[in-house]
Structure formats: structure tokens, C-alpha cells
Amino acid sequence: MSTKKSPEELKRIFEKYAAKEGDPDQLSKDELKLLIQAEFPSLLKGPNTLDDLFQELDKNGDGEVSFEEFQVLVKKISQ
């Protein structure tokens, strides 16, 4: 996935994975894993593990990643 996507495209990608289980406005850890494996596979090849990445993104500690929290990941990888 190119990080040069419009906000609308990023929202659509987020919603595609968030709708797989539970709250359609939040990514569970499993949904985040599927999204990263499909859209950002290189993220899990370095020192970052899925657990570390999930903890970093889940700023409010609710066990899920909102679209706002997901945008942190997009900004991080587009730098």
C-alpha cells in the first residue's frame, strides 16, 4: 500500500479490516495484524512486533485501535 493515499482511501482501508469482527469503528489486534500483513508487510520484519506496535497505537488502552490511533501509524511510516 502506498502511503500517498487520500484520507478517504485510508478510512476505507481501515473500515474494511475493522468490519471483520466486533466494533466496526475499531481494529482488534487480529484485525490490525491482517491489515498490516496485507498493507504494510515490512512493518513486522524489523524489531517491531505486533504486540509492540499495538501497544504503541492503542493510546487510550481500550484494547482496540481507533481510526485516529491508526493515523499515527500512517504518519509514522510516511516520514
Swiss-Prot record:
Where does the record place the EF-hand domain? Answer: 13-48, 45-79
Would the keyword Ligase be found if you checked this record's keyword annotation? Answer: no
Q: Where does Ca(2+) 2 bind?
A: D58, N60, D62, E64, E69
Keywords, ordered alphabetically: Acetylation, Calcium, Metal-binding, Phosphoprotein, Repeat, Vitamin D
- Gene Ontology terms, cellular component aspect? apical plasma membrane; basolateral plasma membrane; cytoplasm
The record's InterPro entries line, in alphabetical order, gives: EF-hand-dom_pair, EF_Hand_1_Ca_BS, EF_hand_dom, S-100_dom, S100/CaBP7/8-like_CS, S100_Ca-bd_sub
Q: Where along the chain is Ca(2+) 1 bound?
A: Q26, E31
Q: Cite a single GO MF annotation.
A: vitamin D binding
Which positions carry Phosphoserine?
S42
**Residue list for modification N-acetylserine:** S2
- Kindly give the SUPFAM superfamilies that the UniProt entry links to this protein: EF-hand
PANTHER family according to UniProt: PROTEIN S100-G (PTHR11639:SF73), S100 CALCIUM-BINDING PROTEIN (PTHR11639)
| Identification of the protein by name | Protein S100-G
Report the source organism.
Homo sapiens (Human)
Organism taxonomic ancestry: Eukaryota, Metazoa, Chordata, Craniata, Vertebrata
